[in-house]
Curated annotation (Swiss-Prot):
GO MF annotation list: ATP binding; CCA tRNA nucleotidyltransferase activity; magnesium ion binding; tRNA binding
Naturally occurring in which organism (per UniProt): Methanoregula boonei (strain DSM 21154 / JCM 14090 / 6A8)
Pfam family, one: NTP_transf_2
Catalytic activity line of the entry: a tRNA precursor + 2 CTP + ATP = a tRNA with a 3' CCA end + 3 diphosphate; a tRNA with a 3' CCA end + 2 CTP + ATP = a tRNA with a 3' CCACCA end + 3 diphosphate
Matching PANTHER family: CCA-ADDING ENZYME
Family membership noted in the UniProt record: Belongs to the tRNA nucleotidyltransferase/poly(A) polymerase family. Archaeal CCA-adding enzyme subfamily.
Binding positions for ATP per the UniProt entry: S50, R53, H140, K159, Y168
Protein name: CCA-adding enzyme
Transcription found in the keyword field: no
Residues that hold Mg(2+) according to the record: D62, D64, D117
Functional note: Catalyzes the addition and repair of the essential 3'-terminal CCA sequence in tRNAs without using a nucleic acid template. Adds these three nucleotides in the order of C, C, and A to the tRNA nucleotide-73, using CTP and ATP as substrates and producing inorganic pyrophosphate. tRNA 3'-terminal CCA addition is required both for tRNA processing and repair. Also involved in tRNA surveillance by mediating tandem CCA addition to generate a CCACCA at the 3' terminus of unstable tRNAs. While stable tRNAs receive only 3'-terminal CCA, unstable tRNAs are marked with CCACCA and rapidly degraded.
Cofactor list: Mg(2+)
Further remark: A single active site specifically recognizes both ATP and CTP and is responsible for their addition.
Length: 460
């Protein structure tokens, strides 16, 4: 494509475009899976996703195969019979498969080194008749395949750009840009470079309606109306922060384009000694809450982790323990909620404000309740009663270790896991090998562009 930077062409030919051999290998596996599905006589097989649309980055061996059933089949039957067929297909190719759950269950399998999802759905005539969220995916594939000609390389550049910036993926942890969203943005703006030129000037809300057929209003900062379903915002998962990071990256790349914008950076773990030294230099206190990961998919657990972290932070703040930063991580076996506090010890007394004196009924109740207290008060200040009361928790660790954290809005599945088994760690003892990368990034927060600028040779 004319106008493309030389290093962009080198990236495409060397790192991003799948080789002919890789394409044929995956196509062969896909053909055999489709033949097995079609031979069952129960469903029709269809390859969807980036592999079907020819927009997959070299090395991303994720194959999405849909099992299309008659729309006359009851929903319950689709879940049971669809899962049974997907399981039998997987079993014919590999012993390495297991059930996963989204809106309804599907099978994930490793077939000859390829990560395969076997997903039952309805074979509906149009997107207007979808009965479940996955039913629209075949229409996405057809739409992009029909229109992406000449822009495939631009999609590959955008996907790698977003991956390197840490904003690729619509999962709950990332809250970023899905592959389908990347494809639609390239289509709408006509290429990678025109997209970045436009994104550098974005100011939310940004509304893109490719089909000019939006069927409702949306509140998200970035709105991209699905051209096959006017009721859906393809960018609904994109958080305000991820959108801002994309804008920042677009500006940075246009100002000083380089390969650094496409280089994926590793998450470097810290060691216990590093953590101890870091905490000593910062003068803050660190607490971790760990517990068994609830047996549900990320889309269910992660929002509850986010809610739980916020609720416990609010509890700490209300109790006088100022939270400087808090975050969460879902691991395969355990979860961690991490809290950095400005202060973690307080005096045994605290100030307690009562009602205004002229609120007679409540004022007299307050005075009567506290008048025999050995602590100062009640006294009048600015027209209302004030007294001193004993502080329930003088140490943040005692509060976090108490049943009080089960009474805040943690989310049902997280609360159940906490109720069975939770562990509170303090200071350098918060270090856990499985969370060492998470802990390191917790203390090295920087925007994507700042990370790139700091990594450039010669930059201080």
């Amino acid at each position: 494509m004319s106008g493309r930077l030389p290093f962009e062409e080198q990236l495409l030919s060397g790192q991003l475009r799948p080789s002919a051999e890789e394409r044929e290998y995956i196509a062969g596996v896909a053909r055999r899976l489709l033949d097995a599905i079609n031979a069952s006589g129960k469903a029709t097989g269809m390859v969807v996703g980036s592999i079907a649309r020819n927009t997959w980055v070299k090395g991303d061996r994720d194959l999405d195969v849909f099992l299309l059933f008659s729309p006359e089949m009851p929903r319950e039957a689709l879940e049971t019979e669809g899962l049974a067929l997907a399981r039998s297909i997987a079993r014919a190719f590999t012993p390495m498969f297991h059930e996963k759950y989204a809106e309804h269950p599907y099978i994930n399998a490793n077939v000859e080194g390829i990560d395969v999802d076997l997903v039952p759905c309805y074979n509906v005539a149009s997107a207007e008749h979808i009965q479940s969220a996955v039913d629209r995916t075949p229409f996405h594939t057809r739409y992009i395949t029909d229109k992406i000609n000449g822009l495939t390389d631009d999609v590959l550049l955008l996907k790698q750009f977003a991956k390197a910036g840490g904003i690729y993926g619509s999962d709950q942890m990332t809250e970023g840009f899905s592959g389908y969203l990347c494809e639609l943005l390239v289509l709408h703006y006509g290429g990678f470079a025109p997209l970045l030129a436009a994104a550098a000037e974005w100011r939310p809300p940004v509304i893109i309606d490719i089909g000019k057929h939006a069927a409702k209003k949306f509140d998200e900062p970035l709105v991209v109306i699905d051209p096959v379903d006017p009721r859906r915002n393809v960018a609904a998962a994109v958080s305000l922060d991820r959108m801002a990071e994309f804008v920042e990256l677009a500006r940075g790349y246009r100002d000083a384009p380089s390969e650094e914008f496409f280089r994926i950076r590793k998450e470097y773990p810290c060691c216990p000694a590093d953590l101890a030294a870091l905490l000593a230099s910062r003068g803050t206190s660190l607490y971790a809450v760990t517990f068994a990961t609830p047996p549900f998919i990320e889309e269910i657990v992660v929002p509850q982790l986010k809610r739980s972290t916020g609720a416990i932070s609010d509890l700490l703040d209300r109790s006088g323990f100022a939270v400087h930063h808090a975050h969460y991580r879902m691991g395969p076996g355990r979860c961690m909620l991490l809290f950095e506090l400005i202060i973690d010890e307080l005096p045994p007394i605290r100030r307690h404000e009562g009602p205004p004196v002229w609120n007679r009924v409540n004022a007299e109740k307050f005075r009567e309740k506290y008048r025999t207290s050995p602590l100062p008060g009640p006294f009048i200040e600015n027209g209302r009663y004030v007294t001193e009361v004993p502080r329930e928790f003088t140490r943040a660790g005692d509060l976090i270790s108490s049943p009080a954290i089960l009474s805040v809005g943690t989310g049902r599945h997280v609360r159940e896991s906490l109720g069975k088994d939770w562990c509170v760690l303090e200071g350098a003892d918060c270090w856990q090998e499985e969370f060492s990368g998470f802990i390191a990034t917790f203390f090295s927060r920087r925007s994507p562009l700042v990370r790139i600028e700091r990594d450039r040779p010669g930059r201080e």
